[in-house]
């Protein structure tokens, strides 16, 4: 059965984030603390996966099929889906996306039968991924938290020319010509939000 996922990074003033955070942060933290989630994260950190183009052959080796499946589940399990699917939770994602502050152009990654966060984390590896606030693409940050976290995000998503080529080779997403690359969009949002004094909301959800 097909699906379409979205990873959206949108900017909002602190008064909006104050309303959003009580709905978002507990769900993120609860998911982060699941034993299955922690085991999958530790396994990926201990043994990062090789180039995705080798996965078909790798799946034939003992334990490797499980390692690939574990990583994909880790980066595609979506605790905030209920905020998108239900209108009686005190916050609705479509309303937040439509009401994002115009000072920062949102990053919107829409993919059919795929996940932007999975591809990004595979491209940058666990050491860089661990520098990103929140959990696997989900976060709700005040303006001050955006400013404080910017150096870590710069370290996670900033690349030398050689590093950029290597990261691009590990991205498996099929972008359209007008799509902003997942290697660029989130960092741009962070920089612009830090410059304009806005908070950031990152949400990884299924659209349908």
Model-predicted segments: where are they?
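Short, well-ordered beta-strand elements
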Residues: 200-205
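Acidic (Asp/Glu-rich) sequence patches and key acidic residues
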Residues: 1-188, 192, 196, 207-208
């Amino acid at each position: 059965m097909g699906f379409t996922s979205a990873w959206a990074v949108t900017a909002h003033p602190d008064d909006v984030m104050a309303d959003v955070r009580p709905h978002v942060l507990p769900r993120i933290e609860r998911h982060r603390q699941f034993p299955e989630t922690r085991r999958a994260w530790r396994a990926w950190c201990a043994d990062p996966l090789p180039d995705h183009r080798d996965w078909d052959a790798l799946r034939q080796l003992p334990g490797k099929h499980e390692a690939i499946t574990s990583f994909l589940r880790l980066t595609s399990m979506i605790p905030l889906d209920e905020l998108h699917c239900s209108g009686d939770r005190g916050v609705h994602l479509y309303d937040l996306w439509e009401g994002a502050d115009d000072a920062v152009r949102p990053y919107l990654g829409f993919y059919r039968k795929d996940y932007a966060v999975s591809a990004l984390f595979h491209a940058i590896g666990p050491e860089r991924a661990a520098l990103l606030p929140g959990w696997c693409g989900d976060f709700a940050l005040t303006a001050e938290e955006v400013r404080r976290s910017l150096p870590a995000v710069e370290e996670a998503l900033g690349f030398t020319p050689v590093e950029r080529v290597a990261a691009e080779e590990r991205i498996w997403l099929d972008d359209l010509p007008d799509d902003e690359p997942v290697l660029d969009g989130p960092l741009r949002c962070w920089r612009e939000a830090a410059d304009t004094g806005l908070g950031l909301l990152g949400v990884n959800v299924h659209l349908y």
